[in-house]
């Protein structure tokens, strides 16, 4: 069982019709303050929440997760410009950088690289990490909490489908649910990977 302080998630929750399905739904998942779907809208809402936090002198932080294909949307950069202008040091943007989107490799569709340099140009504090390494993820979140006067972008280099042999780095699994047999194999492989992580 995987869990966080906000949302306990069991492997069963990863089923296609469950609380862990597809896009996060704020009606069903504690800690999710906005349901997402249309690309680029999440960061705009996050910037608004971070501005509200500043106006209220609140000490909360706002986290938003973007796909690397999603940052092809102009709305992402409009929101980023405002976040930097407002010095939103209570905002952390995480970019899942796996180079795959529904149409194929993002480098072949409409490359946003170098992602880190683009966020730096918008005056973000940028942290590059291996997004499949939990220690690096933890260190990045801790570093982000120390940043003052500018938003943070964590550029997490990941492998899409990591831990499931037949899904790793395969664009065909973008938005596709496994059948019963594939699901069983995937869960077995993830259980083994999880056990190995716990032994570290």
PLM-predicted stretches and their roles:
Residues 17-19, 66-73, 97-101, 132-134, ...:
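Acidic, glycine-rich active-site loops and adjacent beta-strand->loop/helix elements
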